[in-house]
Structures are given as C-alpha cells and as structure tokens.
A protein has these predicted regions:
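Helicase motor core with emphasis on the C-terminal RecA-like subdomain
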Residues: 1-136, 140-143, 167-171
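Cys/His-rich short segments
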Residues: 144, 149, 153-171
C-alpha cells in the first residue's frame, strides 16, 4: 500500500492531497514514510499540540506542504478548495463518512480523485472497535461496514452507487 501511495503522489507532484488513516499511530508512520521519500507531508491528529496542528494546516493552505496525513476527525476540519485527491489508507466506517471525507477533493470545481485501500483485516479491526458497545450500536456499525464493503467491492460505477445510496439520480 505504501509503495502504491508514494507512486500515486509522485504522479501528481505538486498537487494537494489528504490521506485518511484510522489511527494516530498509522498517521505518524505514513507521514514519516512519505517524508523519507521526499514528499512534503505532515501528520495531523488530536494527539498533536494545537500549535503544531495550526502550523501544519497553515503550511498546507500556503502550499508549503503537499500532503496532510490525518485521522478522520481532524481531516474533516481542513477547508482547502484545491485539494486534488483524497486517499483512504483504511476502509471508511460508513458510506456517509466516505462521502463527506471525499468531499474535501475538488471543491474548486476542478477534478478530484478519490482512492480507497482496504483489506478484510481493516473490516476485522473496525468490528473489534465495536466490541463492548451496546448491541444495537454494534448492529448499526456492522450494517454500515457491510455497505462500505459492498461499495468497495462493486464493479458498478461508484458515483452512481453513491448517488443511489443517498436517494439521488445519476445525471
């Protein structure tokens, strides 16, 4: 996955991108790997002090950074119109979340590319996160994950599938 991400970013040199990861640990690891490969990237998550987060966001907005590697909660706070791509390192928790997160790309009306990496291990990890929660919450969480998995596995036009999911018509 790391090699594919590095290759993708290098094919889009100088373009702004956001990479979402499920854990702070993965955010830190991936940002370090990208930096080691001469990619202007930085981590962005709740475990960083507010000064570091603020500097990272400013650097991204001022194009001193090309890539922000973020946890979902913090990546959603980034409002940069010319983000060209969004990459999910891990499968999103729901289609609603995926739709919002990918909405960071192409806000200026130009092309935005969205890439999702996932494996069955991701699904198992997310299911483990649900253990200990009320049964009803677990059931809803599993349903959302199944929908996301079906989306990722589908060979149908994904835009069409997303619009259908939200009750909209494909133009």
């Amino acid at each position: 996955t790391n090699k594919q991400i590095i290759k993708f970013i290098k094919q889009h040199t100088g373009k702004s991108g956001i990479i979402y990861c499920l854990s702070r640990k993965k955010v830190e690891e991936l940002a370090a790997i990208l930096q080691a490969n001469d990619i202007k990237a930085a981590p962005y998550h709740a475990g960083l002090d507010s000064e570091t987060r603020s500097k990272t966001q400013d650097d991204f907005l001022m194009e001193e950074l090309d890539i922000i590697v973020a946890t979902i909660a913090f990546g959603m706070g980034i409002d940069k119109p010319d983000v060209r791509f969004v990459i999910h390192y891990d499968i999103p928790k729901s289609l609603e979340g995926y739709y919002q997160e990918t909405g960071r790309a192409g806000r200026d009306g130009e092309e935005g590319i969205c890439v999702v990496f996932y494996s069955k291990k991701d699904l198992n990890k997310l299911e483990k996160f649900m253990e200990g929660k009320p049964v009803a919450e677990q059931d809803i969480g599993r349903q959302l994950l199944q929908e996301t998995e079906a989306y990722a596995e589908s060979s149908v036009c994904r835009r069409k599938m997303l619009l259908h999911y939200f009750g909209e018509d494909y133009p």
